[in-house]
Amino acid sequence: MTVLDEAGSSAGEPTDARGRVAELAGIRAQALAGPSEKATEAQHAKGKLTARERIALLLDEGSFQEVEQLRRHRATGFGLEAKKPYTDGVITGWGTVEGRTVFVYAHDFRIFGGALGEAHATKIHKIMDMAIAAGAPLVSLNDGAGARIQEGVSALAGYGGIFQRNTKASGVIPQISVMLGPCAGGAAYSPALTDFVFMVRDTSQMFITGPDVVRAVTGEEISQNGLGGADVHAETSGVCHFAYDDEETCLAEVRYLIAMLPQNNRENPPVAACDDPADRRSEVLLDLVPADGNRPYDMTKVIEELVDDGDYLEVHERWARNIICALARLDGQVVGIVANQPQTLAGVLDIEASEKAARFVQMCDAFNIPIVTLLDVPGFLPGVDQEHGGIIRHGAKLLYAYCNATVPRISLILRKAYGGAYIVMDSQSIGADLTYAWPTNEIAVMGAEGAANVIFRRQIAAAEDPEAMRARMVKEYKAELMHPYYAAERGLVDDVIDPAETRSVLINSLAMLRNKHADLPSRKHGNPPQ
């Protein structure tokens, strides 16, 4: 038997079929083993798994079918002609997650540092095309050093092909990027075009220009993790949707996410068996949410009480914490939940919260996931920084996303729903299919105190006791325009419900809306605020 060496040369070839099969087995063994045991040990020493180990954790056992395993680059110069390892540093193929097809590519950092060259890129292009054609999710396991400099502009063109396919696949198949090493420059742009980004603390970083360039240009001293680590992108930039302490947990959560998503935009999310009664009453909700609108509470406790078995997956958990975006199930059906978080900034909408929720609403709409919105919002965050930062433009993103969504949309007002923020948070007037409210609701243009100061300004100023007059006017305004049934009497709320019945009301409403069909005007595409 003769096996080709890294340079692609051999001393002889087998002449019979059995010999050729034996030769193939040897070549495959070489491709599966990777460059060397030393390279594997170096990868493990960094607390990182190899590409094949990662794929094994992601996919169902024994389901991976590799393609282009024997691919080699054809570059010359800089000694590349003498080093032509199989796979060219990226492993591509498909398998299953809980029995459903998923396509995957994984950079092999042991080969050229996972850097992208021409052959490497075309392998990725092919698997992306296959995923789009098959209508199945695509997961990228990223651990690469950017473009392969030795191959010059061909490597850059390879990135262009990836970006083009990311965009083509957007809203068609779920795209999930898992960052498992340093990813700089072009390697960071592809994940930004996908639906979800996962990162692992201490081992994964994303940035356009690294610490050395930052130091040279600006004089700032910063580490890789300080510049683009998992915590930075999960808490500050919003680039990362999920951050975990180790690869095993990270990949397990990727599997969990995939199980909640449809295969493509033409299918509905999978339905799971549910033992949690659809008509389960939740008396505890009255204790979780204070009737006093000025008292904070944790909205996640409300979500836990409403959804199946208290189980949900929060997206962007640590970024823009004044709003919650989560995937959960109601009677086995996947739903997207958008909820104000009174525990942080009183649940106001600001620039980051608007962007976070808008992106989530668009994702849900693209993949046929009904949206449940839980409102307790006192308005938009005031301030010079917000206005100069473009709160009008950013807030309009959320407004546009809701107005453009054709999936079933149900809104529930728990307490405050004030002003423009109330309208933006999927009010009936912008197309919510059903709007419910608890008897603790306060729906108004603004809070009673502010409204009284505007409407009764002269009476308050002329009163012998302005504070007493103000208190009286506030009480009068609340009684006249903010009582719990004011909006329902005018048809702006479909029903005022007992909080304990919320779960059953939501489930019954979603069942009714399951076959909802809505058409948008014919157009090439909208022009949403950016």
State where each predicted segment sits.
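Ligand-binding clefts of soluble mixed alpha/beta catalytic domains
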Residues: 1-530
